[in-house]
Amino acid sequence: MEFTDQALAHCPDIDEKRVGICGGSYGGFMCNWMIGHTDRYGAAVSQRSISNYATKCLYTDIGYYANRLQMEAYPWEDFHKVWSMSPLSGAVNAKTPTLFLQSDEDYRCWMGDAIQMFSAVKRQGTDAKLVLFHGENHELSRSGKPENRMTRLKELEEWFEKYLKKN
């Protein structure tokens, strides 16, 4: 978020009300985190993301040790620490319209995390949309089926146009 502050300070031509964020994998995690901690962005697109470290540590192809390395704790050792580092914990504050793009065969960032974050944001009354890609995995944007890659880009473009385009 500090980067956005610096960019806006150095580039006065940027309309700060029409800045969007987008990220996939760790970038999706960061996107989820930011929408729960600031309302500065006009729209967000979260792709193949992580939202809940308490459950992620039990079902990722990275391995059972991943949470321990990232957070120095498993949920059963220090639930508060793990939960406080999970984007889902901040979803109650989400005000940014967010599109969630997720593959149903992604075993790194499972579909459940996208559904949890989408559901939590939607329940806050914030506009959100979830698009699931059947038969795709973590590599959708790079090596997915051409029709799904095109759909992904179309969804992303339409979301940003809806919320960021000048009338």
Map each language-model feature to its residues:
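Active-site-proximal cap/loop segments of hydrolase catalytic domains
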Residues: 1-167
